[in-house]
Amino acid sequence: MNPTARVEKMRRTMEEDGLDGLILTQPENIRYFSGSSRGGLALIPVEASPILYVYRLDYQMALDEAVGFRVKYGRNPLKKMLRDMAGMKLRKVGFDQLTLSAYNVLNKALKRVKVVDYNRKVHGLRAVKDEEEVSYIREACRIASKGMEAAYETLKPGVRECEVAAAACRAMRMEGSEEDAFPMIVASGVRSAYPHGGCTRRRIGRGELVVVDLGATYMGYRSDMTRTFVAGEASDRQVEVWEAVLEAYSKALENVRDGVPAREVDLTARHVLERRGFGRFFIHSLGHGVGLSVHEHPVLSRYSREKLVKGNVVTCEPAVYIHGFGGVRLENTVLVSDGRAEELTVFPMDLL
């Protein structure tokens, strides 16, 4: 589906909801609908050509990249957009995300226009990937798997966490990653019990758990994967925790398919960990959508009301975090289909 087709699909949804226009401020949303990576703001009217508003330094790049959008530049893209909107017959306009100050400026400038939150509808459209998007994510996952291989080969007692991260980052760049999908995590020892432990200059100790969470970017699309290793020989306790998380992952993955409520997938993993005595140490949801953003819809949470559908790309990442002991997380990016989900990140899940 090209950007123009996405705009038309969005417009049909807007018409059903009585919207005359849609304001986009988030870079990922602007790229999804326009094809440009350099958008500041975008306006999609139902009955006029969509417009991309940028600063002067981004104008030429936006002009070259944008598909089906007029491109305008100025010192203040928001004011320029508001001037254009004042000349349109708009009664109800949606937005994806606005700061409070921008929302106040919008309401003051367009007093007769009703402004409504339309973020969920925008993300609902983005949640189902077309073949081109899947191909980009698949490549980002291939690159991430190479990064994990480099991390594994570098990781040993005495090596600093940041050195492991550097090796993985270099490998992914050499394979064609545009940037890390998110700040990489290499958390060792007791730090592995921090879900977002980042990476430090800490030297990895012998026999310690090491959580490595990384992702690559290709054509703007992200990947996300986590492995947990032991620097040396694993203890019985470490193996016990790791096997529990692996079973939770495997059981949950069996449930990742078209039509299954997202909460059921989360609860499948949660029940495994509860049965094994680790339920209270699983402190986040099971997964999230992946695309132009590394965290998007659908959300695999016990509180979710969403259903998985064919074309969703999600993570499956059960974990156990025990303060003072360490953590184990296993994660793949997977593609939802009619049958068993396809794992797009493929590096082995071996503990050692």
Can you say where each PLM-predicted feature lies in the sequence?
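Active-site neighborhoods and metal-handling regions in enzymes and metal-associated proteins
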Residues: M1-L352
